[in-house]
């Protein structure tokens, strides 16, 4: 399980030196006063149940039918690899700071043509994120090369500033939701 201190740095709330005083990155949208309650949600990482989880996602997609999928972080890795196994069941994908990417050749289906990857702010604060945004762009480019409508939306380039890895918990999450809804509405 992650500690609050580890999450502070990894999720881009602030620097390690700023953790004990609660000093976030300037302009951070994360409600630092909620960190304790947020940390209560942390659970051990289950590394041996991935296949069972993928089977569950596929079963849900089969029951729902072709749909749009939104995923985040480690759930992005799980979901995107699952989509590559059953691209016929997904029409649109919105991946919020995913930790892994599908093989574009397996993920692109004539019916799954719309992909949006969203990345927040303060990426340069951690080499992990610098590498991840580069890999995200490579995934979008690979999907585009195969005929998909795939793009990376780096929020600061859209003047949406201060977002941590926990985009849906940040104070401006409604703004990100609106961007996502607009993107989906243009493609449905």
What do these predicted ranges mean?
Residues 1-42:
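Active-site machinery of serine-nucleophile hydrolases
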Residues 47-68:
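Conserved acidic catalytic loop of the alpha/beta-hydrolase fold
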Residues 69-70, 93:
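Conserved alpha/beta-hydrolase fold motif
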Residues 70-79:
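Gly/Ala-rich beta-loop-alpha elbow adjacent to hydrolase catalytic centers
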Residues 81-85:
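Active-site signature of alpha/beta-hydrolase-fold catalytic machinery across serine-
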Residues 95-155:
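The feature captures the conserved acid-bearing segment of alpha/beta-hydrolase catalytic domains
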Residues 158-162, 166-188:
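Catalytic active-site module of serine/aspartate enzymes centered on a nucleophile-bearing elbow/loop
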């Amino acid at each position: 399980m992650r500690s609050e201190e580890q999450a502070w740095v990894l999720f881009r709330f602030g620097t390690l030196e700023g953790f004990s005083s609660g000093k976030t990155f300037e302009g951070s949208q994360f409600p630092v006063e909620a960190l304790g309650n947020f940390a209560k949600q942390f659970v051990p990482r289950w590394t041996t149940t991935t296949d069972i989880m993928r089977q569950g996602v596929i079963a849900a997609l089969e029951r729902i039918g072709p749909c749009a999928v939104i995923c985040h972080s480690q759930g992005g890795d799980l979901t995107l690899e699952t989509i590559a196994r059953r691209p016929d069941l997904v029409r649109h994908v919105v991946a919020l700071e995913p930790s892994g990417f599908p093989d574009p050749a397996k993920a692109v289906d004539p019916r799954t043509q719309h992909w949006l990857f969203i990345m927040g702010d303060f990426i340069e604060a951690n080499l992990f994120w610098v590498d991840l945004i580069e890999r995200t762009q490579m995934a979008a480019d690979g999907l585009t090369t195969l005929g998909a409508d795939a793009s990376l939306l780096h929020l600061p380039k859209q003047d949406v500033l201060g977002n941590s890895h926990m985009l849906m918990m940040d104070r401006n999450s409604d703004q990100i939701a609106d961007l996502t809804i607009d993107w989906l509405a243009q493609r449905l």
